[in-house]
């Protein structure tokens, strides 16, 4: 990880972190607090500020006097949730992002960091995904509403820089994983879902677990603490319109991923593949050259190391997470 002293940038800033109480947000806030003793952090909680409503966004800026915004908040989920909620995922993410950027411009915000999504890439993007190919086709159908809503914010970012010199940057992370992830099987992504399934099957003595699709697609995963670091490093050091990928550089098939999780959780049963369920995009792997070149960032956590930390966190906290369900 980078070791540059970050105090000069963050000192005396007031940073609004939307989604700051979520999975990525909690890690980012902790990292940010460690970078400066003189930074003020404002997290607009969803029960107090509905960021889809202009009035609530205005109130958030009035209450915080933020000069820097890191926009992490999103309505998001796994393949199943995307299939069930395409309209909601499009509307929530588009409206929230577009209005936040516009109000930030009006309030004179000095720096705005937008978090995009790998789902914005075209379905058949050449691998590894390069930022210049982002608008080269239609996204994978399951994730298209979410991906297109997020990609619209890149167009807005570039337009606002051109017309008003508004300083916003746009980052594209791969799927994240790590401690505090979402382990609800209705909404979770593949890593937390399979960790939970394997541990519960092991404890019950089940002979098999079921996984979606064929297991053939490949994915890239980024440890959440690395992602938080990359976002903050970019906010400090990067000031340009070009989008930037954030990834680990490791590509793994879903089949191999699930076998690794089974091994690390101690589940010795079979993996049954439900091929009636979608695979999603065939391959995902990012070219992360630009992040290294533009703001000297690269991921540092080995996949199995991050996976073990995630499994241990879940086993230590699962009773608090699931309660009496």
For each feature predicted by the language model, list its residue ranges.
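Amphipathic terminal alpha-helices
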Residues: 1-14, 35, 39, 304-325
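N-terminal Rossmann NAD(P)H-binding glycine-rich loop of SDR-like oxidoreductase domains
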Residues: 7, 13-33
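C-terminal "lid/loop" region of Rossmann-like NAD(P)-dependent oxidoreductases
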Residues: 43-46, 209, 214, 241-244, ...
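NAD(P)H-binding glycine-rich loop region in Rossmannoid oxidoreductase-like domains
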Residues: 51-93, 103-106
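Conserved C-terminal active-site "lid" loop/helix of NAD(P)H-dependent oxidoreductases
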Residues: 56, 60, 224, 243, ...
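Conserved Rossmann-fold NAD(P)-dependent oxidoreductase catalytic core, especially the SDR/UDP-sugar
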Residues: 98-143
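Conserved beta-loop-beta element that borders a ligand/cofactor-binding pocket
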Residues: 111, 116-117, 154-182, 192-194, ...
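Glycine/proline-rich active-site loop of Rossmann-fold NAD(P)-dependent oxidoreductases
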Residues: 125, 176-193, 203-207, 216, ...
